[in-house]
């Protein structure tokens, strides 16, 4: 939901917030998917740093989203700071997506259910992205980008709580 909406709304965000023309804004936001790709590439190293504990890695990625989202709530930031924060959120969510859409379904390979689990998770991911796009469209229209970034932080806080509960349960 978060990553797809960054892709969808950020060109318009830079045009609206910083009066950057559309062509320059499109070039400006090209940085976001590049950093997101680097997040995916960094997954093996980050997973090793978290001692192959996927929930711990996801929790840390969501914490990065919280920090970057809170910075975005300030209206006094430059476009460079905004692009860095959005890129970090995008990269962190790319790591989370790798955990949940690629690694997690592998746990079901022994039962022969990997494809089913992967398909179900993909379905809900795309459905969430579609519903999120619609909701964020209304949210931005009515409340501005502040509400969108606040929701990124809130969703990330909820996700950290869930991940940390999973870690505690797994270690008990």
Predicted feature residues:
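Intracellular helix-loop hinge segments at the cytoplasmic ends of transmembrane helices
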Residues: 12, 98-108
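Helix-to-loop junctions at the C-terminal end of transmembrane segments
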Residues: 39-52, 140
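A membrane-interface helix-boundary motif in multi-pass transporters
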Residues: 136-156
């Amino acid at each position: 939901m978060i990553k797809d909406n960054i892709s969808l709304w950020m060109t318009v965000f830079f045009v609206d917030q910083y009066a950057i023309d559309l062509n320059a804004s499109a070039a400006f936001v090209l940085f976001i998917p590049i950093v997101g790709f680097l997040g995916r590439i960094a997954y093996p190293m980050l997973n090793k740093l978290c001692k192959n504990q996927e929930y711990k890695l996801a929790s840390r990625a969501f914490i990065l989203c919280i920090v970057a989202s809170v910075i975005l709530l300030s209206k006094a930031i430059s476009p460079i700071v905004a692009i860095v924060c959005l890129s970090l959120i995008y990269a962190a969510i790319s790591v989370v997506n790798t955990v949940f859409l690629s690694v997690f379904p592998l746990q079901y390979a022994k039962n022969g259910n990997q494809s089913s689990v992967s398909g179900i998770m993909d379905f809900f991911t795309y459905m969430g992205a579609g519903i999120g796009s619609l909701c964020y469209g209304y949210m931005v229209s009515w409340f501005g980008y502040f509400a969108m970034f606040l929701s990124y932080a809130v969703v990330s806080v909820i996700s950290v709580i869930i991940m940390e509960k999973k870690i505690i349960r797994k270690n008990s």
